[in-house]
């Protein structure tokens, strides 16, 4: 999440969702305390604490907290109705959380997963063998059963169906929201 910048479109989509819907819903976001692949944390945020960022509360997790143990601690300490996972191929966040859920370490009512184009033929072609193995293991472990899938378009919904089959029973198509103009 902000102040990150490397994830491009998916980050803008999340920021726009929070800023458009933040008066109606409370957003608690858990993210890394640094740009992915960088060793130094952000210098303008409180690490391993909640920070107010726009219309969201953001927890910038240190490497120790951005782990299975840390996620378990954060999830069990917060009240939430829905968990929104902003990636499919993220073993350190989405995968870790879904394993906790699968083996009963965290309880949650609803989970929405947004693959953000990760199932398009072009995206699947990059590191194809690794992704194919990840998908097969995830299916075998039933990590993605019972989720609500969010697609940005009908094309993306079809890509999800093509890869996940009957596992993706509920797919909601919700186009990306536009930026909110800053208040004057």
Task: Label each region the model flagged.
Residues 72-96, 106-112, 148:
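Short N-terminal targeting/anchoring amphipathic segment
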Residues 47-74, 82-92, 122-130:
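A short, charged, and often flexible helix/loop element on the N-terminal side
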Residues 9-22:
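Short amphipathic alpha-helix
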Residues 1, 20-66:
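N-terminal strand-loop element at the rim of the active site
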Residues 33, 155, 176-177:
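Carbohydrate-associated surface elements
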Residues 1-7, 11, 116:
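Nucleotide-activated donor-dependent transferases that construct or modify glycoconjugates
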Residues 161, 172-184:
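Acidic anion/phosphate-binding donor-loop and adjacent secondary structure
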Residues 131-150:
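Membrane-proximal helix-turn-helix segments that form the acceptor-binding/catalytic region
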């Amino acid at each position: 999440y902000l102040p990150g910048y490397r994830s491009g479109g998916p980050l803008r989509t999340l920021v726009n969702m929070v800023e458009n819907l933040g008066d109606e819903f409370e957003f608690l976001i858990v993210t890394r305390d640094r740009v992915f692949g960088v060793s130094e944390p952000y210098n303008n945020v409180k690490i391993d604490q909640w920070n107010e960022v726009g219309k969201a509360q953001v927890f910038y997790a240190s490497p120790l907290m951005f782990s299975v143990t840390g996620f378990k601690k954060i999830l069990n300490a917060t009240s939430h109705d829905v968990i929104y996972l902003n990636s499919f191929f993220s073993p350190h966040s989405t995968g870790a959380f879904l394993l906790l859920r699968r083996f009963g370490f965290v309880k949650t009512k609803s989970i929405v997963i947004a693959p953000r184009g990760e199932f398009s033929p072009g995206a699947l072609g990059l590191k194809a063998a690794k992704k194919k193995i990840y998908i097969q293991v995830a299916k075998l472990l039933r990590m993605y059963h019972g989720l609500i899938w969010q697609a940005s378009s009908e094309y993306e919904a079809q890509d999800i169906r093509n890869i996940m089959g009957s596992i993706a029973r509920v797919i909601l198509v919700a186009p990306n929201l536009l930026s909110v103009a800053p208040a004057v």
